């Protein structure tokens, strides 16, 4: 056969072969391949960091020492005692006045004060076991109440539980709501610890 004819036939065969359609895999197979190649990155769940005033169930802290300051955070229902170096001595869950939001301004408003005070008296009480009287009203409280034309009241204390709960069996119930006339109530066990830690030099700071 003529050499030119042979080369022509080979070229035609190659051309026809290259012109064949490429077989496309089904859409389902493509999706499966893509899904297999995707790596899903899951973000770790970050728990909020608790600070010293965050209360968790049954984490009341007791220790011995002289308290330089008691800090009450009303919104967290907690009282924390600190020594003169700022170290935590103890932490206690508390109940507030029946109307806990806002600072006390008037006698009978059943609000717990907000401000800086000091301890005036430490005494036993037939109704509340033991109590610690603070220096409410201070100068700012008196001026604020005077501007409103009202009596600021007084007699605000830290106190413990009523007689039926002196053994502590009802602590979970009493501490689950605010029930005082403006005072700060804690467990009898907590009061025993605070009682041994404070004196009339102890500062009381009550925050919102």
What are these regions (language model features)?
Residues 25-50:
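Post-signal peptide N-terminal segment of mature Sec-exported envelope proteins
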Residues 65-67, 74-77, 89-91, 112-114, ...:
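Extracytoplasmic
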Residues 1-5, 20:
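Positively charged n-region of N-terminal signal peptides that target proteins for export
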Residues 5-13:
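Sec-dependent N-terminal signal peptides
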Residues 85-98:
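Short Gly/aromatic-enriched secondary-structure transition segments
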Residues 16-17:
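C-terminal motif of bacterial Sec signal peptides marking the signal peptidase cleavage site
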Residues 51-69, 74-75, 96-120, 139-144, ...:
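N-terminal post-signal-peptidase region of extra-cytosolic proteins
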Residues 121-208:
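Exported/periplasmic cell-wall-interacting domains
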């Amino acid at each position: 056969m003529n050499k030119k004819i042979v080369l022509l036939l080979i070229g035609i065969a190659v051309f026809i072969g290259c012109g064949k359609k490429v077989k496309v895999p089904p859409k389902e197979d493509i999706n499966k391949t893509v899904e297999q190649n995707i790596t899903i990155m899951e973000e770790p769940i970050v728990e909020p960091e608790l600070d010293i005033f965050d209360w968790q169930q049954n984490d009341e802290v007791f220790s011995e020492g002289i308290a330089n300051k008691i800090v009450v955070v009303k919104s967290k229902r907690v009282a924390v005692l600190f020594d003169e170096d700022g170290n935590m001595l103890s932490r206690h869950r508390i109940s507030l006045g029946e109307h806990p939001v806002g600072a006390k301004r008037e006698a009978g408003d059943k609000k717990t004060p907000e401000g800086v005070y000091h301890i005036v008296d430490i005494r036993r009480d037939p109704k509340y076991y033991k109590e610690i009287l603070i220096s409410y009203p201070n100068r700012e409280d008196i001026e604020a109440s005077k501007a409103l034309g009202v009596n600021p009241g007084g007699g605000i204390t830290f106190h413990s539980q009523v007689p039926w709960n002196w053994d502590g069996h009802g602590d979970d119930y009493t501490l689950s709501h605010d029930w005082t006339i403006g005072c700060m109530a804690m467990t009898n066990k907590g009061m025993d610890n605070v009682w041994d830690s404070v004196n009339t030099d102890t500062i009381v700071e009550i925050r919102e």
